[in-house]
């Protein structure tokens, strides 16, 4: 019987560096601004991103990612449209009787979910649909042109 003795492993030499943490945590928007695909995000405040995330989750948290993106696009398209009062995210979101979660105050009961926040930030930089302006769960709005149904929502243009 032949036996073989393995050589002793070489000692591992680790080089260590001191990690310097920033004084204040960076916001998600600050981190995303460093990536080229998030060009344009600097046009939105942290509060606008938070509120858009909250409305998206409250209105479409149980829908597909695509359905959630369409809700974000609905709000952004209203900002760009002359058909709606308001020319920024907050004025569109808080307009009277436009979003149930704002009208009832439920927007403040939902946490700000990271997965939806990522999606909101991506949509702020590159929209999925630039035509949708309205949605509801039971049927199409009578004042807009029916377009398609995604999940539980009927979207109009």
What positions do the PLM features span?
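Gram-positive cell-envelope targeting signals
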Residues: 1-16
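Alpha-helical and His/Cys-centered functional microenvironments
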Residues: 19
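Bacterial extracytoplasmic/cell-wall-associated proteins, especially those involved in peptidoglycan
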Residues: 22-157
């Amino acid at each position: 019987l032949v036996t073989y003795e393995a050589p002793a492993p070489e000692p591992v030499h680790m080089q260590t560096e001191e990690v310097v943490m920033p004084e204040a945590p960076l916001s998600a928007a600050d981190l995303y601004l460093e990536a080229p695909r998030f060009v344009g995000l600097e046009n939105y405040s942290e509060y606008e991103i938070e509120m858009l995330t909250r409305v998206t989750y409250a209105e479409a948290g149980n829908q597909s990612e695509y359905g959630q993106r369409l809700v974000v696009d609905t709000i952004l398209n209203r900002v760009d449209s002359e058909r709606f009062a308001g020319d920024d995210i907050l004025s569109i979101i808080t307009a009277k009787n436009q979003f149930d979660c704002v009208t009832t105050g439920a927007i403040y009961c939902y946490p700000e979910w990271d997965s939806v926040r990522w999606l909101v930030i991506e949509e702020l930089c590159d929209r999925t649909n630039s035509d949708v302006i309205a949605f509801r769960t039971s049927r199409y709005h009578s004042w807009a042109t029916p377009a398609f149904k995604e999940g539980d929502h009927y979207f109009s243009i």
